[in-house]
Swiss-Prot record:
Its main location: plastid. Pfam families: LbH_GLGC, NTP_transferase. GO terms for biological process: glycogen biosynthetic process; starch biosynthetic process. Endosperm. One of its GO terms (molecular function) is ATP binding. Residues 1-45 form a transit peptide. Belongs to the bacterial/plant glucose-1-phosphate adenylyltransferase family. It comes from Zea mays (Maize). Pathway: Glycan biosynthesis; starch biosynthesis. This is Glucose-1-phosphate adenylyltransferase large subunit 1, chloroplastic/amyloplastic. Activated by 3'phosphoglycerate, inhibited by orthophosphate. Allosteric regulation.
Length: 516
């Protein structure tokens, strides 16, 4: 299936999502007559002026309808998508997602059966009308570069006057090593490329994005708030509880939404000091007492001049946005927070990645790839329909091109071109699939030779497991981690255990009768 996007953003309707329902995912619309409520919501949740036509809080993707409001492109504070550029950070070594990142960059890790993590920010950009995109890459970038080329340069996407450019870490005369030292340093090292491009394209604002998150967002609503607040920097923030707070950068705001303090992954007393007054959040979420912290989503909007000044002049020796630049910038720059209450999951660890994938199978799902108005894009594939032969399925994601025979699959994600043989049981597992098919004849020859074909052999039982691409798992194998081991390294045997989850390596072979 091929999608054609019209990315002409000079004019046209501006989409404002409306959602009915209870809980944190509800969007609270303001009544025209509720002036006091309007003022409180504007000040406490958005930190400044809001759109002249409709007032809303940005919420989740699970909404039954979309309201259209004509954008007033002639007004002074109108954010023009043609003057916005996006930078997607490819990440470092990806140590927390190892071993999934042993041969690929973090944004190239498969997710949701048929996507890659890079497809999330890329698709959000296109759906927001932003078509001038840079991707910073460094470690194990071959598969990432290949996926971007196949999907976005050959996939039928209409860029109009925009483009997607991959900027890979490279040697410079003044810095022969060439490696990025942090998120900010990756942009600084290519500032000469970006500065020339921004000048030529008349760019005003830059959206900086992460490549290891799962969410749906209209970035232009974030940019619109940034422009109306006349902020130097705007940080997209999500309300979180205490269990998640210490794992993220936290912001503290005043009643106008201005960021007073930014603290990267605080602990103990520092964590407690970052609590936000709940009356600041009560109009954005239903249970502000339960979510008293505001976590930075790693999504920032910078004025172009502010970003260039910070990286080229003011903080030339600082390398990271979260731990170094933003905590200092809040002291002498206008830094605003924009509260996002939709589904957002940082999948930068094995545990969070595993849980986010399995959550896709639940009903109702907190996150849904199926939205015709804001689709997610990935590489076009010419695959046959999945063949199911006497299978039992319960809460399962099954991708294209799979061959499943007399197996039982429950609460699992099955990637493209997966082969599961008769008598197999998969539960609470993520199977990423395969790059290519092995024909029945090829598989039979391998079995006769005592070898293992790609896929899962007969009568194998698997639970609580991630199976990377092209893995070969024999017959009568048991992978359940029955001893409850939390951490283990067995690369010579083709697997690791992280947070109690067994991870079968890419291209690994697990022989017949093995027990893990």
């Amino acid at each position: 299936m091929q999608f054609a996007l019209a990315l002409d953003t000079n004019s046209g309707p501006h989409q404002i999502r409306s959602c009915e329902g209870d809980g944190i995912d509800r969007l609270e619309k303001l009544s025209i007559g509720g002036r006091k409520q309007e003022k409180a919501l504007r000040n406490r949740c958005f930190g400044g002026r809001v759109a002249a036509t409709t007032q809303c809080i940005l919420t989740s993707d699970a909404c039954p309808e979309t309201l259209h409001s004509q954008t007033q492109s002639s007004r002074k504070n109108y954010a023009d998508a043609n003057r916005v550029s996006a930078i997607i950070l490819g990440g470092g070594t990806g140590s927390q997602l190892f071993p999934l990142t042993s041969t690929r960059a973090t944004p190239a890790v498969p997710v949701g059966g048929c996507y890659r993590l890079i497809d999330i920010p890329m698709s959000n950009c296109f759906n927001s009308g932003i078509n001038k995109i840079f991707v910073m890459s460094q470690f194990n970038s071959t598969s990432l570069n290949r996926h971007i080329h196949r999907t976005y340069l050959e996939g039928g996407i209409n860029f109009a006057d925009g483009s997607v450019q991959v900027l890979a870490a490279t040697q410079m005369p003044e810095e022969p090593a060439g490696w990025f030292q942090g998120t900010a340093d990756s942009i600084r090292k290519f500032i000469w490329v970006l500065e020339d491009y921004y000048s030529h394209k008349s760019i005003d604002n830059i959206v900086i994005l992460s490549g290891d998150q799962l969410y749906r967002m209209n970035y232009m609503e974030l940019v619109q708030k940034h422009v109306e607040d006349d902020a130097d920097i705007t940080i997209s923030c999500a309300p979180v509880d205490e269990s998640r707070a210490s794992k993220n950068g936290l912001v503290k705001i005043d009643h106008t939404g201005r960021v007073l303090q930014f603290f990267e992954k605080p602990k103990g007393a520092d964590l407690n000091s970052m609590r936000v007054e709940t009356n600041f959040l009560s109009y954005a979420i239903d249970d502000a007492q339960k979510y008293p912290y505001l976590a930075s989503m790693g999504i920032y909007v910078f004025k172009k001049d502010a970003l260039l000044d910070l990286l080229k002049s003011k903080y030339t020796q600082l390398h990271d946005f979260g731990s170094e630049i933003l905590p200092r910038a809040v002291l002498d720059h206008s830094v605003q927070a924009c509260i996002f209450t939709g589904y957002w999951e940082d999948v930068g660890t094995i545990k969070s990645f595993f849980d986010a994938n399995l959550a896709l199978t639940e009903q109702p799902s907190k996150f849904d790839f199926y939205d015709p108005k804001t689709p997610f894009f990935t590489a076009p594939r010419c695959l046959p329909p999945t063949q199911l032969d006497k299978c039992k399925m319960k809460y399962a994601f099954i991708s294209d091109g799979c061959l499943l025979r007399e197996c039982n699959i429950e609460h699992s994600v099955i990637g493209v071109c997966s082969r599961v043989s008769s008598g197999c049981e998969l539960k609470d597992s993520v199977m990423m699939g395969a790059d290519t098919y092995e024909t029945e004849e090829e598989a039979s020859k391998l079995l006769l030779a005592g070898k293992v074909p790609v896929g899962i052999g007969r009568n194998t039982k698997i639970r609580n497991c991630i199976i990377d691409m092209n893995a070969r798992i024999g017959k009568n194998v048991v992978i359940t981690n029955s001893k409850g081991i939390q951490e283990a390294d067995h690369p010579e045997e083709g697997y690791y255990i992280r947070s109690g989850i067994v991870v079968i390596l890419k291209n690994a072979t697990i022989n017949d009768g093995s027990v893990i």
